[in-house]
Amino acid sequence: MGASQKNQELIGGLILFSAALLAIVVNNSPLASYYAMLETINVKLGIENLVIDKNLMHWINDGLMAIYFLYIGLEIKREIIVGTLSKPSNIITPAIAAFAGLAMPSLIYLSINHDIKVINGWAIPSATDIAFTLGILALLGTRVPAKLKLLVITIAIFDDIAAIAIIAIFYTKSLSLLSLSLGTLFILAMIICNRIFKINRSSVYVVLGFFAWFCTIKSGVHATLAGFTTALCIPFRENDKDSPANFMEDSLHPWIIYFILPVFAFANAGISFSGISFSILFEPITLGIIWGLFVGKQLGIFSILAVFKKLKWFKLGESFSNLQLYGISLLCGIGFTMSLFIGVLAFNDTHLLNAIKIGVVVGSVLSGFFGYIVLRFIVTNPS
């Protein structure tokens, strides 16, 4: 990771945090009525009977986040072909650690929340916000070796793959087979353009991907799946910086960290304290998310990394201390944007959403703070 990219990750993390803080301030000020317009102003896209009519909040969650998952898909494709995921030995331990880091928070959430009305939120504390995590890693600088950062990114990649699967399987509320079939045809068209006709023009995949996204929204399946599958269809050529996948990933990166994720954070993090008492911190859904992110994530990930290192099944881990592995396990509990995203898919009740936002913010802050403390002040020999 070059110096300029480190600076981008650091600045991006600070902007993301500022956007979330601004949302809370605005939604608890005289400007709150303007903030509410995110859910009252509708925008239409389409012609005649082929129209998508959604409010600004939905456009951010269905549109901008689809672009974010397109970017995630491009990153994953590159890592599979030429990166860390191209070697099976580098895949097994981070994949199992990511799964444990998904399962443990979900189990903690379900152990606290028994009401059928809130069980649907089990996946909220299972996510990791890679943008925030990379921002803290950039802040730590040389205190975190490059290989350790690579391990965090690899775990986060598997976390993202799991999040996409969870959203597609568990948070699809209705299904139009016709629209889904049409979306699949556009995906197949991209595969044909790539594999058979060897078309390298990015614009072709942008247009076909847009129609795949449009049909996916109409089908009822969440649009993030269209973004991810589109990325997998875009040509990637090894040692060719101008291949469509490389070009699009490089082009999207600044938009993701400086615009898309901050806008999402601003739109979704606006906790309104009006009518909320301190007791909301102790509601089961809030506690389930806090303990899931802060305890479940670190417990699931660190237990796998430490055990596999002890058994010598994790060669990369032999160069790290247990404290370093524990520190990054803590950082993986920063759920923030991804947890908020799953939360707004799971519920639409205002009180529940406020409880979710508080739980996500508290759990993420605890994870980020203590992860930073461990890696910055407690680890004695970072190299």
UniProtKB/Swiss-Prot annotation:
Catalysis performed (reactions): Na(+)(in) + 2 H(+)(out) = Na(+)(out) + 2 H(+)(in)
Alphabetized Pfam families for the sequence: Na_H_antiport_1 (PF06965)
Keywords: Antiport, Cell inner membrane, Cell membrane, Ion transport, Membrane, Sodium, Sodium transport, Transmembrane, Transmembrane helix, Transport
Example GO molecular function: sodium:proton antiporter activity
Compartment(s) where it occurs, according to its Swiss-Prot or TrEMBL record: Cell inner membrane
Disulfide linkage: none
Regions that span the bilayer: 10-30, 56-76, 91-111, 121-141, 150-170, 174-194, 206-226, 254-274, 289-308, 327-347, 355-375
Membrane topology: Multi-pass membrane protein
InterPro entries: Na/H_antiporter_dom_sf, NhaA
Chief place of localization: membrane
Any GO BP: regulation of pH
Function: Na(+)/H(+) antiporter that extrudes sodium in exchange for external protons.
Full protein name: Na(+)/H(+) antiporter NhaA
Native organism: Francisella tularensis subsp. tularensis (strain SCHU S4 / Schu 4)
Lineage of producing organism: Bacteria, Pseudomonadati, Pseudomonadota, Gammaproteobacteria, Thiotrichales
Gene transcribed to yield this protein: nhaA
